[in-house]
Amino acid sequence: MSKIPCVAKPQAVLFDAYGTLFDVYSVAQLAEELFPGHGQALSLLWRDKQIEYTRLVTTCNHGAHYQPFNVLTRAALIYAIKKIAINPDETLSTGQFLVDFEPEIELLLAQYQHLDAFPENLPVLQQLKAQGIPIGILSNGDAGMLNATVQSAGFNSLLDHVISVDPVRKFKTHPEAYALGEKTLGLKASDMLFVSSNAWDALGATWYGFTTLWVNRYHLPFEELGTQPTRIGSDLRAVLDFFPS
């Protein structure tokens, strides 16, 4: 964890969902079963394209092309399958592609609602709950996806809020997405801790005004844009350092 001066104890904690609480790459095993030799690459490209699509529909033409996260997730998966798992010499119409690969698409999308939670998450959430700290999710995911994944992980009783950006039709890192945290909890961003394993998300939340923790699970450098998160940790247990007993 980074050596950072002490900060005031946050009044609440908001977590990103995908990559932070839930392992988006846990779909790789099923992807490998469906597309032998391509599972890991497919899961990586799927995630990258998913994030790219959220940025495209948020920034282009003032959000006129917005689509919910589940729609973009499906579109990103189709792209990844076409690029990685299909012979480049094979030409398929969109209709024929869906006929040929609809079962695999649906299986992977269903798995996305049952992503593995990182092993330290449950005890961390339980400790925060025991201290009476309001905790929630602020995610690009739409409500249906989030609720299914939260239920699958057994986190329902531990979370006070599950906030989707869908009502504002803008994905993070748009300020209106982060503002939902303030609106929902009735607190200023500076009084809350925002936790994300996605560096771009931790950066966006820092710019917005949150106290931030970047969960650097993969030991990567932070974004080179002149701003650092409040603290950096290697897993979710670093959250507890903001709340010394």
Model-derived features: where do they sit?
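Alpha-helical elements of Rossmann-like donor-binding domains used by nucleotide-donor carbohydrate transfer enzymes
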Residues: Q29-L30, L45, A75-Y79, L107, ...
